[in-house]
């Protein structure tokens, strides 16, 4: 990645506890951005906070499936730091099961976290980004969205939706 100065920029990275999300959060923080990374629970959020503390970043708990959760989180971030400049929609879960055995709840949970949370988060930051005439929304998908795997119809559908 090129070394771009992101000093003064505010970034939210959902699903920042490990993997791609952690790497993105760390990279944005190292480039000077104030990064808020999310995890599903308090212990994960604390670990993100410890990791990002050297760059003045924070970890926050977020249940991406909850309708009010993402809107409330973004409102809190904007009160504390100002309007977001960067949103990385990375939160994602799997509930693998063959479609013929899949419960509707397994389908719905994946859609809520992996797809609908992207809509909610993006909608919540758009007004501020448009008002400041700048901002970036980055949606992390998967190759599984283009070419599914057995037992992942729900995950493939959500990632293809991005």
Residue ranges and their predicted role:
Residues 31-47:
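Conserved glycine-rich Rossmann-like NAD(P)H-binding loop of the short-chain dehydrogenase/reductase
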Residues 62-72, 104:
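The beta1-alpha1 cofactor-binding region of Rossmann-like NAD(H)/NADP(H)-dependent oxidoreductases
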Residues 98-99, 106-111, 137:
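Substrate-binding pocket helix/loop in short-chain dehydrogenase/reductase
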Residues 100, 147-153:
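Active-site loop immediately N-terminal to the catalytic Tyr-X3-Lys motif
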Residues 122, 158:
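Active-site helix of classical SDR
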Residues 142:
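Residue(s) in the substrate-gating loop at a strand-loop-helix junction
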Residues 10, 17-18:
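Conserved glycine-rich cofactor-binding loop
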């Amino acid at each position: 990645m090129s070394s771009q100065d992101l000093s003064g920029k505010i970034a939210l990275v959902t699903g920042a506890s490990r993997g791609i999300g952690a790497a993105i959060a760390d990279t944005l923080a190292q480039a000077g951005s104030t990064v808020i990374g999310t995890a599903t629970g308090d212990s994960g959020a604390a670990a993100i906070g410890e990791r990002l503390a050297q760059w003045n970043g924070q970890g926050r708990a977020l249940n991406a499936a909850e309708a009010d959760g993402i809107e409330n989180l973004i409102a809190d971030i904007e009160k504390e730091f100002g309007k977001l400049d960067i949103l990385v929609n990375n939160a994602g879960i799997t509930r693998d099961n063959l479609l013929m055995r899949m419960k509707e709840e397994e389908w719905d949970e994946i859609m809520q976290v992996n797809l609908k949370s992207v809509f909610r988060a993006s909608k919540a930051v758009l007004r501020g980004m448009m008002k400041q005439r700048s901002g970036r929304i980055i949606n992390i998908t998967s190759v599984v969205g283009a070419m599914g795997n057995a037992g992942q119809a729900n995950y493939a559908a959500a990632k293809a939706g991005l």
